[in-house]
Amino acid sequence: MSDINATRLPIWGIGCNPCVGDEVTALLTRGEA
């Protein structure tokens, strides 16, 4: 998950909100998978 978050966060510009970034990453992962 660390690698995914590190890749997702900068793209969405949610580096200042790790908690939100984690939720967004989970939603994206579920949507793609």
From Swiss-Prot:
InterPro entries in UniProt: Amanitin/phalloidin
Post-translational note: Processed by the macrocyclase-peptidase enzyme POPB to yield a toxic cyclic decapeptide. POPB first removes 10 residues from the N-terminus. Conformational trapping of the remaining peptide forces the enzyme to release this intermediate rather than proceed to macrocyclization. The enzyme rebinds the remaining peptide in a different conformation and catalyzes macrocyclization of the N-terminal 8 residues.
First and last residue of the signal peptide: none
Pfam families the UniProt entry points to: Amanitin (PF24112)
4-hydroxyproline modifications at: 18
Residues passing through the membrane, by range: none
Chain coiled-coil ranges: none
UniProt crosslink position (2'-cysteinyl-6'-hydroxytryptophan sulfoxide (Trp-Cys)): 12-16
Residues bearing the modification (3R,4R)-4,5-dihydroxyisoleucine: 11
PTM-bearing positions, type (3R,4S)-4-hydroxyisoleucine: 11
Keywords from the named record: Hydroxylation, Thioether bond, Toxin
Molecular function via GO: toxin activity
Positions bearing the Cyclopeptide (Ile-Pro) cross-link: 11-18
Propeptide residues according to the Swiss-Prot or TrEMBL record: 1-10, 19-33
Domain of life: Eukaryota
The UniProt record lists the keyword RNA-binding: no
Role played: Major toxin belonging to the bicyclic octapeptides amatoxins that acts by binding non-competitively to RNA polymerase II and greatly slowing the elongation of transcripts from target promoters.
Family: Belongs to the MSDIN fungal toxin family.
This protein's name: Alpha-amanitin proprotein
Lineage: Eukaryota, Fungi, Dikarya, Basidiomycota, Agaricomycotina
Gene: AMA
